[in-house]
């Protein structure tokens, strides 16, 4: 009794030519994927550095704008008060950076009220000096 064979020609599993071809392609694929990963990482770092630099520059510009706007406002308030003949002075304390309002008597020049008062400004100046020395 003859048994019919329904199977195809059986090839040995893992022939050398197939393995060699696959491993050569695998090495090339790995190298190109590593290079792509390195390129992506470098691009990401460059974008992050650019973002940080832009944020720092923007913060510095805003700080300059705030200082100039505040100085302009102090000048405008002083002009307005002098135009209505009231003795009131606005200034920015240099050491503490705080805005100061001084109300004084026109005839004598005596200070009636200062906001914040001189003692508080002195405390703020000392704290600022301590911070700078630390």
Swiss-Prot record:
Lineage: superkingdom: Bacteria
Taxonomic source organism: Vibrio anguillarum
One Pfam family it belongs to: FlaG
Family matches, as InterPro entries: FlaG, FlaG-like_sf
NCBIfam families, per the entry: PRK08868.1 (NF006465)
Region (Disordered): 1-49
Disulfide-bond pairs as recorded: none
Name the record gives this protein: Protein FlaG
Biased composition (Polar residues): 1-18
SUPFAM superfamilies, sorted: FlaG-like
Family of the protein in this entry: To FlaG in other Vibrio species.
């Amino acid at each position: 009794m003859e048994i019919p064979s329904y199977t195809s020609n059986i090839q040995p599993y893992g022939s050398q030519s197939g393995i060699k071809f696959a491993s050569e392609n695998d090495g090339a694929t790995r190298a190109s994927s590593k290079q792509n990963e390195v390129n992506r990482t470098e691009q990401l770092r460059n974008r992050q550095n650019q973002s940080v630099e832009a944020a720092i520059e923007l913060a510095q510009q805003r700080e300059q704008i705030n200082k100039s706007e505040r100085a302009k406002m102090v000048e405008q308030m002083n002009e307005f008060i002098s135009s209505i003949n009231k003795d009131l002075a606005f200034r920015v304390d240099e050491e503490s950076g705080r805005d100061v309002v001084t109300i004084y008597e026109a005839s004598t020049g005596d200070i009636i009220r200062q906001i914040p008062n001189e003692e508080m400004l002195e405390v703020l100046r000392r704290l600022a000096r301590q911070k700078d020395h630390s």
